[in-house]
Each structure stands twice: as structure tokens, then as C-alpha cells.
Swiss-Prot record:
Protein's UniProt name: Probable HTH-type transcriptional regulator MepR
Keyword hit for Nucleotidyltransferase: no
The HTH tetR-type domain, residue ranges: 10-70
Annotated gene: mepR
Keywords, ordered alphabetically: DNA-binding, Repressor, Transcription, Transcription regulation
Functional description taken from the UniProt entry: Probable regulatory protein for the mepABC organic solvent and antibiotic efflux pump operon. May function as a repressor.
Location of the DNA-binding region in this protein: 33-52
GO molecular function terms listed in the Swiss-Prot or TrEMBL record: DNA-binding transcription factor activity; transcription cis-regulatory region binding
Keyword set includes Cell cycle: no
Amino acid sequence: MVRRTKEEAQETPAQIIEAAERAFYKRGVARTTLADIAELAGVTRGAIYWHFNNKAELVQALLDSLHETHDHLARASESEDELDPLGCMRKLLLQVFNELVLDARTRRINEILHHKCEFTDDMCEIRQQRQSAVLDCHKGITLALANAVRRGQLPGELDVERAAVAMFAYVDGLIGRWLLLPDSVDLLGDVEKWVDTGLDMLRLSPALRK
């Protein structure tokens, strides 16, 4: 029995993450147990604990997987050495929206994060995790906007803190709206218009000036 447990503990984390994704998507994060995930993955709960301490770490793994494909663009826009930070942000947003529509796994994970991750009393750790992720994203957007101001791509009097909040709210809200009512928004066909709407807000809105 001990030998079997050790063998199962060597199961790849990717297999467990894939099972967690399916379980969370079907049942929601709060209603899914590690036993549910273990059954789908074909392993014991002990094998899950070998790689992940709890559901919060599995949710974080799903969130991290969303960032892998466009992390280089985010880092470029945040770098003071980047000559076209706003251009990098535009490419990043185009990639985010295109992947959301065209990649089924990306869509499922976003569906989990937006509509199937309930912040109940026993989900405090996941709530704190999401708060941390939002603050990290805010920091990255702020750096990118500050770089764009320095490069003359955005107004010098732009309030980058307020603008970062507005940009996050715009993108996150558009994603949430499309996931809820995909037929009401042509996110793929009008992707450049949707991205440029957000960027024009940064360039032109008097309410975002200091």
C-alpha cells in the first residue's frame, strides 16, 4: 500500500491540474472537493497533496497557465527600456481577447475565475489569492502606463494609478460580459476596435488627468 501511494505521488501535476479544471468548470470551485479531483485524475488525494496543498494552489496554477503565453509582452510593456510600451500593451490585449475566443481551455479557465469561483467563508484563501493577483496586475499596468507617459505615448498629466484601475475594469468587465453573453459581443471580429476603445480612454479622457 505504501509503495502504491508513492507511485501515485509521482503523477504529473499537469494531470491533476487538468482534472481540477474539469471539476471546477462542472461543479464550481466551492462545491468541488479534492476527492472529486482525485477521482477524475485517477489518483489518490495523497498524490494531490504531493504537489498541491489545497484547492487554492490549484486555482493559482490555472491562473498562472493563462499568463504563460503572453508574459513576454507584459514584461516588455513594463520595462523602462521598451521603446513602444503602449504598442506592447495593445499586442497583449489583442492576444488576450483572441485566445479567450479561440482557445477552449483559456475560455474555460476564465469562466471558472469569473463565474464559478465563489468567495464563501471557507474560501478565504482563494479570495486573498485573487486580491493579490489583482494588485499584481494593477502594478504591471501602472508601470506600463508610466512608461508610455515617459515615451510621449500618453498625456503627461495622466493619473496612472486611476488609469490603471480604469483599464483593468474595462478589460475584466469586457471579458466577464462576453463569457456571460458571448452572442451579444463580436469580440473576435471587432477585437481591434475593443482594444483601441480602451486605449483611447487612456489617451483622451479628461477624467483620467491629474
